[in-house]
From Swiss-Prot:
One GO process term, biological-process aspect: positive regulation of osteoblast proliferation
Disulfide feature: none
Protein name per Swiss-Prot or TrEMBL: Transmembrane protein 119
Lineage of origin: Eukaryota, Metazoa, Chordata, Craniata, Vertebrata
Phenotype on disruption: Mice show a significant decrease in bone formation and bone mineralization and the mineralization defect is independent of calcium and phosphate metabolisms. Testis is smaller, sperm number is significantly decreased and testicular differentiation is perturbed. Significantly reduced cortical thickness in the mid-shaft of the femur at postnatal day 14 (P14), and progressive bone hypoplasia after 8 weeks.
UniProt organism field: Mus musculus (Mouse)
Keywords: Biomineralization, Cell membrane, Cytoplasm, Differentiation, Endoplasmic reticulum, Glycoprotein, Membrane, Osteogenesis, Phosphoprotein, Proteoglycan, Secreted, Signal, Spermatogenesis, Transmembrane, Transmembrane helix
Gene name of this polypeptide: Tmem119
Length: 280
């Protein structure tokens, strides 16, 4: 029965798939079998059994054994992960950073140039900024009424008034000088010449008066009948300058004749005085 028992054990040990080596018999059982005669008979009857120290079957792996990865060990800390990222992508980081810095520099330069162009357009180059901006005026805006300086008095206006008054005075003086002179009657048979500035009508009146005076005696003609007072005659003679020396002599002779007539008395023939019509 012992060989049948051994065969049953071998059959039970063969279909186990997950064991790499055959199941070895326990050492106590082998010793018991070796000490008895049955073990010798069994060994003689079954020479195909392997020795007890060697495995019964050769290893036959049915599934692949898991092998360790050759790559780096995954980081266990955040800082180590960042360092590993920089080490792997150092070239990419350098290129992207340089491009970003270059773009920022170009944008800043363009903005600065634009501001300078605006400043030069508002403040022309020929005039500095100080002429346009008052740095002392911190508040800005127009000045208050108290800060506005008072205007200096305009002397030209006063001069204009003075010249107008002077012009009016000159005009009045000229009109006084241009008044018509006293109409002098002829003395001693000589008629007085009219003064310059008289009109043609005045000359005609003077000529008609001379003709009437020649018809009547000179002694009967007085200043009162003529209606010309002595004061007005003297005033007009002073206001109007004599045109020539001949006219001055004629007026002097006429005044002397009037004085002599006043001293002698009234005229002898009153009829002659009635004929003379007084002329103003």
């Amino acid at each position: 029965m012992v060989p049948w028992f051994l065969l049953s054990l071998l059959l039970l040990a063969r279909p186990v798939p997950g064991v790499a080596y055959s199941v070895s018999l326990p050492a106590s059982f082998l010793e018991d079998v070796a000490g008895s005669g049955e073990a010798e008979g069994s060994s003689a009857s079954s020479p195909s059994l392997p020795p007890p120290g060697t495995p019964a079957f050769s290893p036959t792996p049915e599934r692949p054994q898991p092998t360790a990865l050759d790559g780096p060990v995954p980081p266990t800390n955040l800082l180590e992960g960042i360092m590993d990222f920089f080490r792997q992508y150092v070239m990419l980081i350098a290129v992207v950073g340089s491009l970003t810095f270059l773009i920022m520099f170009i944008v800043c330069a363009a903005l600065i140039t634009r501001q300078k162009h605006k400043a030069t357009a508002y403040y022309p180059s020929s005039f500095p900024e100080k002429k346009y901006v008052d740095q002392r005026d911190r508040a800005g805006g127009p000045r208050t009424f108290s800060e506005v300086p008072d205007r200096a008095p305009d002397s030209r206006h006063e001069e204009g008034l003075d010249t107008s008054h002077q012009l009016q005075a000159d005009i009045l003086a000229a009109t006084q000088n241009l008044r018509s002179p006293a109409r002098a009657l002829p003395g001693n048979g000589e008629g007085a010449k009219p003064v310059k500035g008289g009109s043609e009508e005045e000359e005609e009146e003077v000529l008609s008066g001379q003709e009437e005076a020649q018809e009547a005696p000179v002694c009967g003609v007085t200043e009162e009948k003529l209606g010309v007072p002595e004061e007005s005659v003297s005033a007009e003679a002073e206001g109007v300058p004599a045109t020539s020396e001949g006219q001055g002599e004629a007026e002097g002779s006429f005044s002397l004749a009037q004085e002599s007539q006043g001293a002698t008395g009234p005229p002898e023939s009153p009829c002659a005085c009635n004929r003379v019509s007084p002329s103003v």
